A protein has these predicted regions:
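Flexible loop/turn segments at secondary-structure boundaries
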Residues: 44-45, 70-71, 115-117, 173-175, ...
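Gly-rich Lys/Arg/Thr-decorated short loops/hinges at beta-loop-alpha junctions or inter-strand turns
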Residues: 1-10, 66-76, 101-105, 181-183
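C-terminal non-catalytic interaction/assembly regions of soluble proteins
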Residues: 178-332
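Short, basic, glycine/proline-bearing loop/turn elements
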Residues: 6-11, 136-140, 227
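Accessory alpha-helical/coil subdomains and C-terminal extensions
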Residues: 37-39, 45-49, 53-54, 58, ...
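Glycine-rich oxoanion-binding loops at beta->alpha junctions
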Residues: 1-33, 42-43, 68, 79-82, ...
Length: 332
């Protein structure tokens, strides 16, 4: 549980129809009876196709969701997301403290997540009080409007001096095209352009304000010290549930997490299974109710949903200027 990535290896090999047709024979040869594909949307699509190929056999196929992007359908959330959310939130909190100490520029933090803004949105958990970073959050679920972005940055810069913006790597224009052309496309894989650098350059050229960009990238899915304890426990639970389901005779399903309502507002969840056909290649986006009206932040509804998953550890940052003005106000 302290190894980043996966100890068993991973693959992006695109399986052909011939590959699927051979699978029952290969499984029989190696006496494989239980197949538990673990991954995101593409993996769940593969899971469904393997199940179809093995129809009529005693081979059981059960999908285990695992993606930091949190974009798999018919589950409250996915293993991996809580840890990536915690990493980004705590990293943005540290960046915010740094920018606040020398408030002379705009810092753009680019977050992973492709077409879904779940990771980007989690940066809101960095805040403890009004004025804390991030000051602006932009998700791919809303069209990116350059003029509004520049207006927001200018207003906050004049008010605060230092501004922290978190933007998704998948930001799109009104016409649905990426704001920065992808470097490369191959099947489902898209190698995004440098959105953070593009936005920083935009601020410099259009507003004449110093700006820089930061790109944590895969650090958020590889950081064991910032792994969410809730996420770790639920990842183990997902694997255990998948195996138990397969041993019980289930096939063609994926493990899902169902959040339970509680009178005291505490977080409760139980695992279940859903038909794999309901999940295959469906991309789950951040709902409208989680995004504010202007499209430059998230709502409290999202924060309440995300907080128990990320298990963010807020550290105390000292600000002597705030301390001075607080003491001065008390004396007066």
């Amino acid at each position: 549980l302290t190894t980043p990535g996966t100890a068993i290896g991973s693959s992006r090999y695109a399986l052909s129809e011939e590959d699927y047709a051979r699978m029952p024979e290969i499984f029989a040869k190696w006496k494989i009876k239980y197949v538990l594909p673990t991954g995101g949307n593409g993996t769940m699509d593969t899971c469904g196709k393997i199940r179809r190929a093995c129809e009529g056999t005693d081979i059981r196929v059960v999908g285990i969701p695992k993606t930091i992007d949190n974009d798999i359908a018919v589950t409250d959330h996915t293993p991996g997301y809580g840890s990536s959310a915690r990493y980004l939130a705590e990293t943005v909190a540290e960046i915010g403290a740094d920018v606040k100490s020398l408030p002379i520029h705009v810092c753009i933090v680019e977050a992973m997540g492709r077409n879904a803004g779940w990771i980007t949105a989690a940066s809101a958990l960095a805040r403890e009080k009004k004025g804390d970073a991030p000051h602006l959050i932009y998700l791919p679920e809303r069209p990116f409007r350059e003029e509004e972005f520049l207006e927001d940055v200018k207003r906050l810069y004049e008010e605060l001096g230092g501004v922290v913006v978190v933007a998704s790597e998948g930001l799109k224009k009104e016409n649905g095209e990426p704001i920065v052309p992808p470097i490369f496309r191959s099947g489902r894989s898209v190698y995004y352009g440098d959105v953070g650098a593009y936005l920083a350059e935009l601020v410099i050229r259009k507003l004449g304000i110093k700006a820089r960009s930061e790109k944590p990238g895969i650090c958020g899915r590889a950081s064991i010290p910032l792994q969410s304890a809730v996420d770790r426990e639920e990842a183990v639970l997902a694997g255990r549930t998948a195996l138990e389901s397969a041993l019980a005779g289930q096939t063609g399903v994926m493990v899902s997490f169902v959040r339970e309502a509680s009178e005291d507002g505490s977080y409760r969840m139980h695992p279940g299974t859903v038909p794999i056909e309901e999940v295959m290649m469906y991309e789950r986006k951040v709902p409208e109710s989680y995004i504010n009206e202007r499209g430059n932040d998230v709502t409290e509804e999202f924060v309440s949903w995300c907080k128990p998953l990320a298990d963010v550890h807020h550290r105390e940052f000292i600000d002597f200027q705030e301390y001075y003005w607080e003491r001065k106000g008390k004396r007066e």
